[in-house]
């Protein structure tokens, strides 16, 4: 940790105090943990970032995870960056009501900033976000750049917890922020489109901390010309889905393969209208080609042209309970898988397959076309990609 109590005053390791000054304070025995009031020792070595450490190994309620040198460097770097923006950050401010200690707290904005380097579960993430929300505190997660893997043009491996912390920009696109304290650089991921459980298409922007104003950039919409490249990535992903469906043995794939097989359909030859990035599709962690194909199949099997959205929702809820379908958790986004389902229905409406009659009722306009061969499927995917 970077903060301690000395004579009932907060002191920190981000200032200009010398090693000799910390040694003198330590000899007086007056350096205490602000949370548990136990004595702490100033660690002022040559290799690691200067910090305070507890004398004993007793658990302190104010700390949830061991700190690495990378994490402490990041906190110091972010602190100096905010100071340069004329902000007044408080390092490791302890919020006793919720027993949480954000890495940086901006009291003027009532805003907590977490620099996340260690592993954290999605349940822990949601719990911390809800803790801040219970005190009407805004919060943001900035992730250590080590957590992000760049796989090529517009392609990244994003950890599932990182993706859960995503917010929407002014255009409704997902975004995340990363920071590298070793390079003192921010990496902004914009227009994030998940392709699989970890793989996502995203546009990355690099900024030196000197050229990045968080409060101006946080929800700004960036140039979307790169979306042309996304089409190629998505087309490749659809090809992958088609080529691997027959040998994929996951419970979700096996279930939908079985349903289609008994209705004389092949999952490999799913309709070109399925497996598309419709509005909010990412609320399902299950691949879009699976749940969208099944939704089309449900509509196809209707004996009448009119259908209620409740009919589809009830069936999807059944599949969710059986864990055949999986969803993603986005604590910052006030939406659910039902938004993904409605987004896809509106997508089908734009392509003249269905039309909305009332808020809850839709009408089937024409039959869905299934490719008869893999070659035809690839060709239709390409044609559909160019049109959409």
Regions found by a protein language model. Name each.
Residues 1-87:
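N-terminal cysteine/histidine-rich coordination modules
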Residues 78, 102-121, 132:
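Conserved catalytic cores of phosphodiester-cleaving nucleases, focusing on short active-site segments
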Residues 81-98, 105-107, 116:
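A short acidic/basic microdomain associated with nuclease active sites
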Residues 117-170:
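Catalytic cores of nucleic-acid endonucleases
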Residues 162-220:
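A conserved mid-domain beta-alpha-beta active-site/ligand-binding segment of alpha/beta enzyme cores
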Residues 203-258:
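Eukaryotic partner-binding/assembly regions in large regulatory complexes
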Residues 245-388:
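Extended, amphipathic alpha-helical scaffolds
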